[in-house]
Amino acid sequence: MSTEANKPRGNQHQEAKSDAEIAQAAFMRPIVDVAAEKLGIAAEHLAPYGHYKAKIDLNYLSSLDSRPDGKLVLVTAISPTPAGEGKTTTTVGLTDALNHIGKKAVACLREPSLGPCFGVKGGAAGGGYAQVVPMEDINLHFTGDFHAIGAANNLLAALIDNHVYWGNELGIDPRRIGWRRAVDMNDRALRSIVSSLGGVSNGYPREDGFDITVASEVMAIFCLATDLDDLQRRLGNIIVGHTKDRKPIRASELSAAGSMAVLLKDAIAPNLVQTLEHNPAFIHGGPFANIAHGCNSVIATRAALKLSDYVVTEAGFGADLGAEKFFDIKCRKAGLSPSAVVIVATVRALKMHGGVAKDALKTENVEAVQKGFANLERHIQNVRKFGVPVVVGVNKFSADTDAEFQMLHDLCAKMGVPCVSSDHWANGGAGAADLAHEVVKLVEGGSADFKPLYPEDMPLWDKLRTIATEIYGASDITADAAVRKRFDELQKEGFGHLPICVAKTQYSFSTDANLRGAPSGHVIPVRDLRLSAGAEFVVAICGDIMTMPGLPKVPAANAIRLASNGTIAGLF
């Protein structure tokens, strides 16, 4: 084994400035060494993708079932702002910090989508000295999982149109085909299209469209399936459309599930990479947090729990969306029980919630921190409703003042919640050691008594109303007669036991993206109700849903380039 493995990073902190420079300057250990030394996994149970990425054999993971589970820690955040919060960075930094203080910890993250990488968001591998690597690979094709998911999605679409072309034995109504094609790219031109043009030999023309791969139900199924059998069962349960008599048509009736599962058989094995400090990270799956549940795969999470003492994972957007779905969908369905929650906040984001413009965030404003705390306070109250202890993790920025942090600390103290400042972006795991100690204290305190927000047998309408009033601070929900009828239909058809997945803006507790802070007394309008029978949840659409994003006027792709030596510049 190379002695390079144990060398410190030296003065990389001074030499490298951007996230990309830090990642490219990092020394990576062979992933087989990380797996062996950190997780006890022999090389024979790995399928390497080069030197620094690998998939873990599902049969090996099945052999771990008798092992006790480690402790599950969720990292969530306040409502997102343009100022940024750093949820992924904190997830990675906390994982490194737990290892730094002597705990055996693993990170569990979602895979980034190509669309946002080339659009406006950039990469999603953490930041500063709290990153997962190889950063470029993770942000681009990685191990090909998303391509496999897109292929499975589009195979089903092809089988639907092929069935209609060759006589339509099932009587599928072309006007009621709900299954759309998918591509992992931001491309607004594909949102609504007309397919099968060009003559009789090309099929029956109809309105169609594309979703970005991370919005596909196949992605949600991929992340909620517990094994290959469950994956194939769920794929078969997908409802692709209806007959003229409104009878649902499932993928199993098209004999599609087997072929779709075959396309996913390698992808479903979890991916293993490493942090900058050579700690293991599972990165697997990546559903949208609005149209789906916004969490990494159940298979990866379960594997990590069998292989470590602490598993640090994250859920998309703020705690009102990501954490609620993590608890009510992922944990409920997978039998997971979290031991602690970290709510990530920044002083500057709280100031934005307090009414400060982005260009004025560097000016001290203690009053705005106090006012913006209402948003964090609501999230703390919400997480407590699930019976899980909370710590507030504050990402430090150079413009933060002592007075501003003291105000935040005092407000948290009044709620009986620990508030810990971290600078893992600048100092890696050592910079989050205090946060790690606080998380261990919460976990070992044994106060967690996890329970979902609502029981399975509660009617669908009441489930959604419970989420709206208990989590969003709304006074009620409202829907027109057609949507109310859809609630009743799903209830009568036997889907009333499924959890609700709310699709709404991530920027506010309301459906108005511009309403920051902690609004209350508003009414949540329900525009539509969609059944994801394979993923086994009901999507309540409470705002404009964008399942195929577009590129901005100046996309991130314009700044990305490839050097003659193969180095990528401008990705992150």
Swiss-Prot record:
UniProt keyword list: ATP-binding, Ligase, Nucleotide-binding, One-carbon metabolism
Keyword Transport part of the UniProt annotation: no
Catalytic function, reaction form: (6S)-5,6,7,8-tetrahydrofolate + formate + ATP = (6R)-10-formyltetrahydrofolate + ADP + phosphate
The protein's annotated pathway: One-carbon metabolism; tetrahydrofolate interconversion
GO MF annotation list: ATP binding; formate-tetrahydrofolate ligase activity
NCBIfam families assigned: PRK13505.1
Name of the protein in its database record: Formate--tetrahydrofolate ligase
Species, as recorded: Granulibacter bethesdensis (strain ATCC BAA-1260 / CGDNIH1)
